[in-house]
Amino acid sequence: MVPAPHTQHSPSSTMLNSSSTTAHAAPSTNGDVHAPKDHHLSSPSDTVSAPVNRKKQKRRQKQAARLAERQLANGHVSTDDTTQNGSSHANPERYHSDDGGADGPDHEQPTNGDVYDKDGQDSMDAHVDSQNPQGPNGTESSQKSTGRKSKKKKGKKARNNSHAQGDETSTPMSTPSVSMSHPLPPPLPSHLASHNILKPAKNRSIWNTSTQEERENIKTFWLELGEEERRQLVKVEKDAVLKKMKEQQRHSCSCTVCGRKRTAIEEELEVLYDAYYEELEQYANHNQGSFEKGSPMVPPPRLYQPPLRSPGQHTRTQGQFHPSRGRIHELTEEDDDLEEDYDEEEDDGDEPYSDEELDEEDEETRAARADFFAFGNSLTVKVADDLLKNDGKHFIDMMEQLAERRMQREEDTQYGIAAAHESLHSGHNHGPFDDEDYDDEEDEDYDSQEEEDYEEDEMDAMTEEQRMEEGRRMFQIFAARMFEQRVLTAYREKVAEQRQQKLIEELMEEETRNEQRNAKKAREAQKRKDKKRLQKQAKEEERARREAEKAAEEAAAKAEQEKKLEEQRKKREEQRKKKEAERKAQEEERARKEAEKLRRQREERERQAEAERKQREEKKRREEARRKEKEERELREKKAKEERDRKAQEEQAKKDTAKGGEEAKDQEKRDDQAKRSSQQGPVPIPSNLHHLQGFSPAVAHSPHVPSATPVLPKAPTPARPRQPSQQDSHSSSPHSQAPSTDPSQASLSPRSMPVSQSSGVASGNSQQGHGLHAMLHQPQPSTPLSPLGRSIPPGFSSVNGIPPNPPGLSGMVARPPVGHDLPSYPPHSGPFISPFRGYPAPSGIPAPPGINGARPMPPGRGFPLEPGQGFAFHGQQIPGAFSTPQGGLPHRHSRQPSGSLERSPLENHAQPMPISRPSPIKRPSSTQQDQQKGGDRTTQRDVDDLSAHLGSSALLDDTDVPLSSTLSQSLPGATAPGTFPGPARASFGGPSLFPDPLSASKHANFAVSPAVSGGTWGAQIPFGTSAFPSAQTWGTGHASGWSNNAFGSGGHHRAHTSRPVAIRLLVIQACKQLNTMSPFKGADGYHDVNLVLRQVEQLRPQNEPSISLKEMLDICDTEGNTQNGGGTFSIKKDETREFVKFEPDNNSAASGHRGSIVPGEIGSPVPSSSLPAFGGIGTPSVLRQYSSPPMGF
């Protein structure tokens, strides 16, 4: 193919073609680019034509285009070619119209960063088409433009973010040039460049250059670039394209074929870019001329061409540089098709090419087959636009095709044109994206083209040289498109730098002008200030003169006023001094009175302290006297105890000697009896028999195991009269009594009870006697004890002799014995103490009257097993563990002779005996020597225990009388001689029938029996003596009479609320009651001692002796503890009276707690009855509240 003479354009014409590019290269101020609306477009009513078949129309147009190309190829050039050749820049009115469009009210500002709007492209297309109304296809130009406009309007809604509508949309690879190091500003919009054209010539500068000047500037910029800078631009472009290709092929396969293909692509790209740079260099060095071989090169990279607003416009301007090809109108139509393709591609969001677009591409490619340059031009534009949009798939496909052709040419040159063409489709292609593979679309295009005969003819006519030329032109077009952006970018950088420098200079000039202007204003303001200052100074002087005159007048008036004030001040000072003297005199008088008052108070406190000191001294003297007396008594008691121990040992030795011989004879009988007792168990014997034999001193207190001899009746021996001294000695020591019998004992024989009981009596007695010894083996206090707190003396008859059913009170029975080995719970209480709290002792104390028919409690049980209805006990008398010989009954201290020992009529009824618990078998002492050895070891301990129990009462002379103050001289548990031991809690009879003394046991829930409480010093009141006149004398009261209380025998140990403690508790209660009684309240809680004494007398039990005032005051001096109620008493005296006040402390709070202790807890009292206490009827609550556990065991 021989080029036409005017194929290569001169630089000047190229410069003219690039005016629009230069106009649009100015930077935008805000990043948004404005596109002018075209006012030359005809209205829709003018341009709308009848709808036609688009495909057929395109086919007809392309057929006409091919005919025109053949005519042009034959040398027939249309006269409109030259006109069309310069249509893009030969009409200056177009820019004015654009400017007018920009100034119009419909001026748009897209916000998506697009440089040009589609309306601007329509305007350009309309101008280009209107320039050639007489071309070969001139009759259809208006219809085509109208169709294009309608299609563009239809697809414009989806093209807000399109970058393919112009070549200035964005810079695809913003690689800085060698001359600039900062990023480029965006290109200047077309309407801003159009504004610059309308500026006057005198205002033209770097900010507003004309199109011609812009062209000259771009030309000068390109020519001024050195060889190295130009090569650097090409190198940057080549590196960017290689990098993009590598990114696109990163996910392709790694087979050998693909690897060779990639290598071939890189090599082909190197070769193409090197050849392209040589052509560029040649073009820059030789501004005009033609290349020596082949068809003419595509002009340099459209450096000075008009702006490519769309791929269509780019194609059209490229076609204008080859007028010999005759592609002017045909390319315009193809541009429209490509625009439609882009519009529809953008409308289709999910797939890159729609079916309609593929159909249009089929027609396009069929037309392009007739002209390879047109095909390459169209494809290259699209590939370049895709690469500008960061989508290099089409470019890579194009390069792969070139590489495949090269490899195919090297490997298989013998197949010629057909094989070369086949290599386009049979290559081992692995596109990076399966859904958007361009080769598949191209294959479809080629398949559809091959269906047409005339396309197949042209394909067969292609040669390898033409294919290579086609690929070369395609790459040149692509490289020109891309390189154009690089050159424009470099130029824009330079222009932006110049404008930036110019802007800085203008800003500096403006700042200088502002400074000068401000300086001038400051000078003028200073002048005005000076003028005002002078005027103000004159006014100040005038005002100062007037103020001086006024001050002089005021000073004279002030002096006169001060003189008057001074006189008034002197008068006030004199009055103040006078008042101060009077006030001081009053304060001195008040201070004197206060000092006198303090002195009197101090003297009063001193007198009170002296009185308290004297009281304490007196109290110390009394305590010292008591202590000495106590020591003397203890000394006497110790001597008497030693004497008694000596006598008891002698007597015990005699008894053991006599008894040892008898035991040796009856050894075999004792063994048999022991066996029978282990098999059958001991059968309780009548209580009278226990009275006779069960509690002899030798058996009860002998430390040896007695032999189990049968109880046989002895000959009656007349009882010899007992002397008072003997009675005293016997009552204080059980060892001193001889095992004598009463005449009444001789009448009792084993026939009055079952024969089987005789064997259990001795065994039971021996075990109980051993248990008593174990209990007595405890340290005892050496303080004198009242007889009420002692154990039953040996001379008593058995406690079991108390009738179980007093007259009118039937069905009462005591609890059976608890076994042979007595516990040691209260060790001092002997066999009369119950080992379980809340139940009667094994001594057979009957139950209270009115609770009938209840069964006896089995041993070891805390409650009755099967109580009858209504708490009825069986009317059976359980014999005690042991009994006391009747002859050993202690008498009154006044040596009253012993009374009758006959049985009480209350005991005459039959007493069935339940079988008691069997005793364990023990080996009796075989010889008298063994018994004597055991007696020697324990004699001394027994004597000590007895002396501790009996205290110093054994030392009393015949004429001695106990102290009158019973409570003040006794320890807890003591009772006064001549008083009636009564219940501490549950006396239903009240004080009139059964008085409740202060010394009564607080744990005796029912009555305290004379046999149990040990009150032997006074005449014991038998049941019926005071309340029942028909009762017998006291002599029979121990054996058969009912107790002196309403509910029989109760407390088994001594009471433990002494008289001082009781009186102190009464005083505390009286003070508390007076505090709560408003009429008797004293000042600050103090009460008159006489009033307190009257209140105490009201609270005192009737059977207690009266309390004197001195005794009460002495007790108030004692310190409080947990036993006596705690707290302290404050005594205050005045001229005539004494006052007392009780102040509680922490020990006082213990009273409420002790009242809430239930039986069974630590510190709780030991109840003496099997029935619960009935709440202390008739007993002061203060005694129940502040009573303590037994002391001095």
UniProtKB/Swiss-Prot annotation:
Keyword Ribosomal protein: no
Biased composition (Polar residues): 76-90, 129-140, 312-321, 741-769, 1182-1193
A family per Pfam: NST1
Coiled coil: 448-659
InterPro entries tied to this protein: Fungal_stress_NST1 (IPR051195), NST1 (IPR025279)
Subcellular location: Cytoplasm
Assigned keywords, A-Z: Coiled coil, Cytoplasm, Stress response
Basic and acidic residues biased stretches: 91-128, 508-527, 537-675, 933-942
Ranges for region Disordered: 1-197, 288-368, 422-468, 508-815, 857-942, 966-988, 1145-1193
Low complexity biased stretches: 10-29, 64-73, 169-182, 722-740, 914-926, 972-986
Chain intervals with Acidic residues compositional bias: 332-364, 434-463
Subcellular location, principal: cytoplasm
Compositionally biased region (Basic residues): 53-63, 146-160
Disulfide bond entries: none
Family: Belongs to the NST1 family.
PANTHER family, per database record: LD36051P (PTHR31780:SF10), STRESS RESPONSE PROTEIN NST1-RELATED (PTHR31780)
Role this protein plays: May act as a negative regulator of salt tolerance.
Protein name (Swiss-Prot/TrEMBL): Stress response protein nst1
Organism in which the protein naturally occurs: Neosartorya fischeri (strain ATCC 1020 / DSM 3700 / CBS 544.65 / FGSC A1164 / JCM 1740 / NRRL 181 / WB 181) (Aspergillus fischerianus)
